[in-house]
Amino acid sequence: MHQVKLEEAEYEWDQTIADVDIVIHVPKGTRAKSLQVDMSNHDLKIQINVPERKVLLSGPLEKQINLDESTWTVEEQERLVIHLEKSNKMEWWSCVIKGHPSIDIGSIEPENSKLSDLDEETRATVEKMMLEQSQKRTDEQKRKDVLQNFMKQHPELDFSNVRDQI
């Protein structure tokens, strides 16, 4: 989790290649009806209305989100957890809100993913690349086998320059 402490807000956030999760600690006993969470594809505004009205987090998002897949919930009446589904599931965010402290996305180590985690189009592309790579290895091995067989059948020929290519 990346911790962000600002004058007006304090939150923690983490991400995968597909989503961003934000955790904001709220006063114990906070219920969902005392919060106002406004999300759009590009902006986020979180306000608590009890005991007095206060904006907890507000501003333009680092990147666009899929609003229909993004959610929020209050956990144990003390944590607001916001789940943002990234529109582009192939890029890392350096921050949640533009202008807030950023992280070095070059140092992120992604978790291993499975083909089943990918969307249909990406999965098809990866499977095609894997098949082509496998076919290339098979073709190379066949060529090496044919050459080695030929060399065995013709020991009278000089293959000294060919050995480096096997």
Curated annotation (Swiss-Prot):
Keywords: Cell cycle, Cell division, Cytoplasm, Cytoskeleton, Microtubule, Mitosis, Nucleus. GO terms for biological process: cell division; protein folding. Disulfide bonds: none annotated. GO terms for cellular component: cytoplasm; microtubule; nucleus. Residues 6-97 form the CS domain. The keyword Zinc-finger does not apply. Its main location: cytoplasm. One of its GO terms (molecular function) is unfolded protein binding. InterPro entries: CS_dom, HSP20-like_chaperone, NudC_fam. It is found in: Cytoplasm, Cytoskeleton; Nucleus. Belongs to the nudC family. This is Nuclear movement protein nudc. It comes from Schizosaccharomyces pombe (strain 972 / ATCC 24843). The gene is nudc.
